[in-house]
């Protein structure tokens, strides 16, 4: 995949927290990268104890998502761990998601709880009672095809049988919808049924209403038609207190490779049985390949005779380089939006787009946490991101040190001011726990790709 602008080997780590031992202090799970053991950190009188069992047996997986929830309805928290990344064969069991049951405080892997028809790289996992039977179900989003970036992935719906085992279904309306990075489960239309909001790379913000045993896509109807983005994250809350969920959605920002009106074309351009992805920028109404001549010819050697000179290639559009029929038969996607934003409900299933401040658009937003950090009764946003694994000619997304946006006391706006967290690195997840030494202090735990976990007092 020589033509890809970035690598996709830094999806994690994931952090999840819950007070597992009922001591009033949040415990947390940190997922490991490929070759690293995941751990639970359990609070005790002297700090935290690291628990590695039973996660050692799955250290060859890359744990990209994790959720504490009561899977078997026995009153304690079990753990769902999603495996992803691109460093695996699509025939590898290391891509399998896992359920660990909490048995009197000891987590045990349950190999019979989950069943999938094939292996895939998970990009998103969320829980909610989809069928209103009182048991928590799981929605899983496929991140990408591990062999070919660009092929759209699907949603899997795991229905809880009530005993912590799950029946997997693949709704046809949720098949091949995109390269999914995050999911929010909430009731959009106040009908007491859980709906799903799906975001991903080269995807529209996709709102699916849970309607009569099918999922109805309503994004265009509620004002989200032109929202194709490189979305990385989504969280929901009710910021304007109207009883309707609002959303914070993280994108790649305005300071890097991805631009509005950008496209990609996916096809077997050299007829060798393998798909290639060609990216273009739109300039004066025409689409131009972004790849330099040498890298394009290395991937597609038959173009060498056609692209003899650099100066000629520099003015050639995608239609000059490739045959019209080949382009028409390609799977194509385009971008409308690269800014991170807030979707604020306006009632009647419609949303207003509010863009985050310019400084936050300097880099990507991969991690979002919503918390009243300063205890003023207003919801604050904690944001983090960056993506270093971009080709040098395009430049890394490295201008963010994380942000706190403080909720406003002014009813005319959502947030008053913001300040940097001063955390350097590729932030992929956040968790908030109480400070062991101070009951009114909050500790932010930041999961940094290819780096140590960072803790920071945010209150």
Predicted regions and their residues:
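Beta-propeller-forming repeat regions
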Residues: 1-459
């Amino acid at each position: 995949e020589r033509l890809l602008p970035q690598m996709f080997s830094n999806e994690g780590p994931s952090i999840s927290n819950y007070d597992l031992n009922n001591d009033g202090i949040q415990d947390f799970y940190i997922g490991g990268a490929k070759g690293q053991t995941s751990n639970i950190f359990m609070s005790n009188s002297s700090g935290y104890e690291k628990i590695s069992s039973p996660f050692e047996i799955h250290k060859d997986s890359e744990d990209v998502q994790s959720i504490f929830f009561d899977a078997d309805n026995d009153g304690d928290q079990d753990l769902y761990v999603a495996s992803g990344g691109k460093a695996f064969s699509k025939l590898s069991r290391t891509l399998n998601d896992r359920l660990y049951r909490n048995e009197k405080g000891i987590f045990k892997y349950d190999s019979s709880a989950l069943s999938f028809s094939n292996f895939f790289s998970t990009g998103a996992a969320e829980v909610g009672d989809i069928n209103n039977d009182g048991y928590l179900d799981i929605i899983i989003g496929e991140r990408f095809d591990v062999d070919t970036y660009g092929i759209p992935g699907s949603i899997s719906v795991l229905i809880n049988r009530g005993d912590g085992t799950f029946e997997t279904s693949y709704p046809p309306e949720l098949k091949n919808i995109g390269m999914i990075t995050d999911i929010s489960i909430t009731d959009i239309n106040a009908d007491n049924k859980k709906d799903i909001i799906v975001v991903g790379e080269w995807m529209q913000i996709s709102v699916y209403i849970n309607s009569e045993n099918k999922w109805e896509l309503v994004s265009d109807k509620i004002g989200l038609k032109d929202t194709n983005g490189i979305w990385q994250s989504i969280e929901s809350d009710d910021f304007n207190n109207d009883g309707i969920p609002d959303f914070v959605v993280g994108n790649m920002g305005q300071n890097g490779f991805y631009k509005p009106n950008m496209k990609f074309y996916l096809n077997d351009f050299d007829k060798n049985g393998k798909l290639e992805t060609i990216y273009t920028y739109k300039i004066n109404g025409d689409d131009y390949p972004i790849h330099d001549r040498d890298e394009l010819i290395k991937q597609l050697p038959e173009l060498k005779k056609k692209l003899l000179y650099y100066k000629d290639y520099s003015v050639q559009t995608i239609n000059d380089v490739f045959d019209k029929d080949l382009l028409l038969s390609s799977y194509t996607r385009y971008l409308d939006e690269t800014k991170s934003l807030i979707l604020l409900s306006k009632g009647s299933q419609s949303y207003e787009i509010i863009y985050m401040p310019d400084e936050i658009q300097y880099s990507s937003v991969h991690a979002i946490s919503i918390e009243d950090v300063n205890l003023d009764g207003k919801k604050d946003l904690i944001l983090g991101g960056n993506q270093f694994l971009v080709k040098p000619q395009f430049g890394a997304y490295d201008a963010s040190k994380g942000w706190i946006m403080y909720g406003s006391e002014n009813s005319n706006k959502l947030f008053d001011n913001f300040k940097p967290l001063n955390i350097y690195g590729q932030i992929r997840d956040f968790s908030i726990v109480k400070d062991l030494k101070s009951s009114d202090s909050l500790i932010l735990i930041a999961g940094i790709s290819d780096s140590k976990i960072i803790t920071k007092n945010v209150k």
